[in-house]
Amino acid sequence: MNYFELFGLPIQFELDGSLLSSQFRALQKRFHPDNFATASERDRLMAVQQAAQINDAYQTLKDPLRRAEYLLSLQGIEMNAEQQTLQDPMFLMEQMELREELESVTACADPEAALVAFDTKVTAMQRHYLAQLQGQLAQSEWLAAADQIRKLKFIAKLKNEVERVEDQLLG
């Protein structure tokens, strides 16, 4: 049973977050190990394993990037173990320029405002790539979606760097 089936959801990128959360709570309640305290050792172990699978499935489905990777894995495309690199020189150049821009934020007259503006720009890029990914997955364009996921991973790392710089500025 795949994660979507576990939660009774259609196998697609777009999903109802509130339905996912309510299904998660219901499954958590149903398979909580405390409910099996008086059960046999085997049943208790199965409940713990089921609870772990439910938690893993929820964490995967609630995160758009992990959900997209999981959808590709259902199509036989494994992104986690891949050695494939992104073959988009324009995107890679843009990423280098963005990282240089982020490094220069701390030298600005108002670094906090510069960081907020930079983060706003990166968030807009992230939304743009997520929208493209959603369309590619809906059209079963698996290889294009895989490239989009690679791009989104770059952007996720950049967002982490923004948080690091923010911590430095506030620290």
UniProtKB/Swiss-Prot annotation:
SUPFAM superfamilies in alphabetical order: Chaperone J-domain, HSC20 (HSCB), C-terminal oligomerisation domain
Query: Record's GO cellular component, any one?
Result: iron-sulfur cluster transfer complex
Q: Which Pfam families does this chain map to?
A: DnaJ, HSCB_C
Q: Which PROSITE patterns match?
A: DNAJ_2
Its keywords, alphabetically, are:
Chaperone
J domain segment(s) = 2-74
Q: Which GO terms describe its biological process?
A: [2Fe-2S] cluster assembly; protein complex oligomerization; protein folding
What the record says about family reads: Belongs to the HscB family.
Quaternary structure per UniProt?
Interacts with HscA and stimulates its ATPase activity.
Purpose of the protein: Co-chaperone involved in the maturation of iron-sulfur cluster-containing proteins. Seems to help targeting proteins to be folded toward HscA.
Q: Which PANTHER family match?
A: IRON-SULFUR CLUSTER CO-CHAPERONE PROTEIN HSCB (PTHR14021:SF15)
Protein name as annotated: Co-chaperone protein HscB homolog
This protein's encoding gene: hscB
